[in-house]
């Protein structure tokens, strides 16, 4: 789980600048203002269970966030993939199950090409406490 605002801003900038199949735009990012927490989960693309392991890491981060915050208002999800791995169609139901199990009001996602040798998924969450209108 990442809470450092500068690191999160760098991650958001990467989302916009990465060559994409499904694009995240600057307008999408403008909707994420405060209370930002991020997950940056990676696994070597050579691992046949790479995407499964990434989802397991994301699931742990999601649970950690919900242990501290009452709700996740928004999610910005970016799936990075290497040319060597190329997300398999059978990876996608697992990913959709993860997204469906996050109690979230809205989300936007993108898919882009990653230069590294890892499968990587970055999620920026806007989380809030239920007893406050403020985001944390």
Where do the PLM segments sit?
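Tubulin/FtsZ superfamily GTPase core signature
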Residues: 1-136
């Amino acid at each position: 789980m990442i809470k450092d605002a500068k690191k999160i801003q760098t991650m958001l900038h990467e989302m916009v600048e990465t060559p994409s199949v499904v694009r995240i735009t600057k307008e999408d990012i403008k909707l994420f203002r405060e209370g930002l927490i991020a997950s940056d989960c990676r696994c070597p693309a050579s691992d046949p269970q790479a995407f499964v392991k990434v989802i397991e890491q994301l699931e742990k981060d999601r649970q950690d966030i919900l242990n501290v915050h009452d709700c996740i208002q928004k999610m910005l999800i970016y799936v990075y993939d290497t040319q060597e791995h190329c997300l398999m169609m059978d990876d996608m139901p697992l990913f959709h199950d993860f997204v469906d199990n996050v109690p979230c009001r809205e989300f936007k996602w993108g898919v882009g090409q990653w230069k590294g040798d890892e499968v990587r998924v970055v999620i920026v969450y806007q989380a809030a406490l239920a007893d406050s209108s403020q985001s944390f």
